[in-house]
Amino acid sequence: AYSENDSHALGTSYSDYETRVIAGNTFDYPAIHGEAIAQSGYSYTSASHKAVAEGHISLGDYPIVDLIVGKQRTTTIGRGVSGYHYEAISDKLQEALSLYTAEGGNLLLSGSYILDDLWHGPMSTDEDKEFAKNTLHSSFGGGMASRSGEVYAPSTKFLRKRLTLTFNTTPSEEVYSVESPEVVTPVGKQSYTILRYAHSDRSAAVAYNGPDNRTVHLGFPFETITDDEERTKLMAAILKFLSKN
């Protein structure tokens, strides 16, 4: 009886990853993005979200901004006595991005909870949704969009050659896993789907081709694409699109 109780004390589950090292937050994602940027023939520099939100960095100095959001979303720390932290895109960052794009700046952003946090986060407001629609030109179409991480590019004016790629959805040593990629729905006539999840055919990424600026929004973190060549091909296509404005 005691042996049986011991085996169930912490819950019953499989032991697939019991002896394996699992990647967490390695904090090197600007380098991963940067490698794909450099391989595409562009130079880059990096800064923190906080530096941008607090005005230490002028986004207007750069023709293209790549916003790395990863799996960040609003949450509490410990028992939650200090309130909520880690919004995917804070109010101040929203202001900076809205001003940047209104003045002609071109934006790439990727993450798995960006729209979910703006729509359903514990601090979300109607203004958050309007920011997504008016600045990101996208809206929340749902989470849990893919278990396989397989994505393909339909033939569009964004990418005429068919591209397939896979992002990580299982625990691994190389990069963190994406449990809930989101469906990114285009908003407006000038916004359209450029990537789809292979098994559901739902929208995985959206491009906006406006009169004054362009944006690309991925519903999964760019850095979790498992193949270096696939990352570079996608980044090259994105930068080519964003550079045309």
Locate each region found by the language model:
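Aromatic-Pro/Gly-enriched surface loop or interdomain linker
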Residues: 1-61, 222, 236-245
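The substrate-binding groove and active-site-proximal loops of carbohydrate-active enzymes
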Residues: 17-25, 67-88, 221
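Stable alpha-helical elements in mature extracytoplasmic
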Residues: 29-33, 89-96, 231-238
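Loop/turn elements at helix/coil->beta-strand transitions in domains of secreted/extracellular proteins
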Residues: 38-45, 60-64, 102-107, 189-190, ...
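Alpha-helical scaffolding within the catalytic cores
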Residues: 50-56, 91-96, 200-205
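Solvent-exposed loop/turn segments at secondary-structure junctions
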Residues: 51-54, 69-75, 107, 113-117, ...
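A glycine-rich, often tryptophan-bearing local segment used as a flexible ligand/cofactor-contacting loop or short
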Residues: 73-180, 191, 196
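A glycine-centered loop/beta-turn motif at secondary-structure junctions
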Residues: 106, 134-135, 143, 162, ...
